[in-house]
Amino acid sequence: MRRFLLLYATQRGQAKAIAEEISEKAVTYGFSADLHCISESDKYDLKTETAPLVMVVSTTGNGDPPDTARKFVKAIKDKTLPPDFLAHLRYGLLGLGDSEYTYFCNGGKVIDKRLQELGAQRFYDTGHADDCVGLELVVEPWINGLWAALEKHFLSNRGREDTSETLTMASHASRDAVTPELLHVESQVGLLKLDDSGGKAAKVLEQNAVNSNQSSTLIVDFEASLTHSVPPLSQASLNIPSLPPEYLEVHLEEALGQEESHASVSLVDPVFHVPVSKAVQLTTNDAIKTTLLIELDISKTDFSYQPGDAFNVICPNSDSEVQFLLQRLQLADRREHHVAVTIKADTRKKGAALPQHVPERCSLQFLLTWCLEIRAVPKKAFLRALADHTGDSAERRRLQELCSRQGAADYTRFVREAGACLSDLLRAFPSCQPPLGLLLEHLPKLQPRPYSCASSSLFHPGKLHFIFNIVEFLSNTTEVILRRGVCTGWLATLVESILQPYMCANHVDGKKALAPKISISPRTTNSFHLPDDPSVPIIMVGPGAGVAPFIGFLQHREKLQEQHPGGHFGATWLFFGCRHKERDYLFRDELRHFLKCGVLTHLEVSFSRDVAVGEEEGPAKYVQDSLQRHSKQVAGVLLQDSGYVYVCGDAKNMAKDVHDALVEIISRETGVEKLEAMKTLATLKEEKRYLQDIW
């Protein structure tokens, strides 16, 4: 069987899952995938590799390769490597990203570019899958086209002309081969082909006269929804993926009294269990978003940080949602039983392994509370598996539609874009009764949530501040449910007893109540830090909660200036924005203090919802408007004074708008075309003078 090397670089498991899918399908087409995480450098050697290489690479942070790929990227970026170092290598790469972020798929692009520079050649076009619109829109056709590309590679390299049988098996894949980065989402949905992991043609479900006779007259009265389809989908024969092979055996055993630790859900970083020493509401009660500041007491730990760092908060799922699942799965009376997980002896899943995020011994309630991301949007493979555990034929048909090729648009609209989760599906399809093992196979790890440090350890020794908006939204899949963010909702509830209301932050000790504790862990180092040279000018752009790291910056600068009264400190610009001056102007008093004492030299604040009277050119509604108004100064700081620009906050709109504003400013002030201005900004990023902390 023809071997290829298959490497994945993953941050949250997405790239790994896709690589495993490729590995499972490979056998069908006469290939053998040698599957490894890119961090397992002792198990492969690109310098001597003769087989083709297939890579699946995700993107994290500000367009960075995932943590698992850091050593790999560092190794291939070694400037001493000759330009023909990998000239023998042939590869295909699938990049995963989110176009809401400025540096889309940059993790894959960085590796792709460097492989090219070292002489490696593509045997298959690079794919760029966009999580903003649905990874599957590129992932599925990219995988389908991979087999024909591999076949062509082996034929051309080894001169095999006796592979007609294998070519026949690969022919249906070649018909669907596309250039993924050119795939137009809206017009190319029909290109998707869902093949099963066993390699047979996708199963076709014929809906006969029973379906059409009983439903057609009624269905026209409905609009399409999560639970109902309309023609032509409701009358179509469906191409659905075959059932993913089950591979986990789960037994619930009587508990023996062992204690569980939150640390068991974190496998890499050290975990610190620290008390909350203060909690303050930073916004008025009538503000559109409620923002809280939390102070942690880290004085009895060796946790250290510097302004600009971020850290993880280990959070649980909502207790009410966990209890719903226990009741719905008919396991409420066994919530304290211990979960024992093993690999099924007869599983067909290649490389089946126990999920690392499931502790060896934990209770069922602990598992659902601390280990599984029960809010995750179900992938199509999960829907396919759920369909086989759904008793009602109409409900089963609808789940099959949602995971089918024909139902791709419905899946995007009613599952993906609606943010439907397992609880929503179980409410929508009452006859669906999945076994616990299925949840462990398909639900990802509950990830810790990252937050920016909003303080300086020089200014607040032994303390760590962070701020957040309490996320609230309506789940409107089948019934309207008000939900809070997994972590922000939990934190808000946790600090209720000690929360200081708006404008009462000066009462340092807060309410006399038992201080709650939370578990935190450090995040890998980043470059979102103040310049080493304090004389270098900086521009900070942080609307809303994005101001958090800059409070730490300014606190740090204030202490440095106190320690070095004769020192030279560069100009500091802060572009802050909020909706209303009187409702959500975060840290107003602190910013005025920094301005008064000279730590902050320029403060520009924009209010997007306030109506200003008497301003000739109208108020600056957003931070990008304020940047444009100070175009010459901004360009001077960046291009003449070798300054830094920091952007923190919303990736979906703000970061893009600020990026575009900076391009326009550079173009206008230097008299160059926008393409050249974009190159200049890219150079600033490479020099780590244009830094982003966006989410």
Curated annotation (Swiss-Prot):
It catalyses: 2 methylcob(III)alamin-[methionine synthase] + 2 S-adenosyl-L-homocysteine + NADP(+) + H(+) = 2 cob(II)alamin-[methionine synthase] + 2 S-adenosyl-L-methionine + NADPH; 2 cob(II)alamin + A + 2 H2O + 2 H(+) = 2 aquacob(III)alamin + AH2. NADP(+) binds at K289, S608, R609, Y622, V623, Q624, D657. Transmembrane segments: none annotated. Keywords: Amino-acid biosynthesis, Cytoplasm, FAD, Flavoprotein, FMN, Methionine biosynthesis, NADP, Oxidoreductase, Phosphoprotein, S-adenosyl-L-methionine. It comes from the Eukaryota. PROSITE patterns: FAD_FR (PS51384), FLAVODOXIN_LIKE (PS50902). It is an enzyme of class 1 (oxidoreductase). The modification Phosphoserine is found at S171, S187. FMN binds at residues 10-14, 93-124. One of its GO terms (cellular component) is cytosol. The keyword Phosphoprotein applies. InterPro entries: CysJ-like_FAD-binding, FAD-bd_FR_type, Flavdoxin-like, Flavodoxin/NO_synth, Flavoprot_Pyr_Nucl_cyt_Rdtase, Flavoprotein-like_sf, FNR_nucleotide-bd, NADPH_Cyt_P450_Rdtase_alpha. GO terms for biological process: folic acid metabolic process; homocysteine metabolic process; methionine biosynthetic process. It is found in: Cytoplasm. Residues 4-147 form the Flavodoxin-like domain. Its EC number is 1.16.1.8. FAD binds at R449, P450, Y451, S452, G485, V486, C487, T488, W695. Its cofactor is FAD; FMN. Residues 166-245 are annotated as: Hinge. One of its GO terms (molecular function) is FMN binding. Residues 269-531 form the FAD-binding FR-type domain. It is debated whether the reduction of free aquacob(II)alamin occurs spontaneously or is enzyme catalyzed. Forms a multiprotein complex with MMACHC, MMADHC and MTR. Key enzyme in methionine and folate homeostasis responsible for the reactivation of methionine synthase (MTR/MS) activity by catalyzing the reductive methylation of MTR-bound cob(II)alamin. Cobalamin (vitamin B12) forms a complex with MTR to serve as an intermediary in methyl transfer reactions that cycles between MTR-bound methylcob(III)alamin and MTR bound-cob(I)alamin forms, and occasional oxidative escape of the cob(I)alamin intermediate during the catalytic cycle leads to the inactive cob(II)alamin species. This is Methionine synthase reductase. The lineage of its organism: Eukaryota, Metazoa, Chordata, Craniata, Vertebrata. The gene is MTRR.
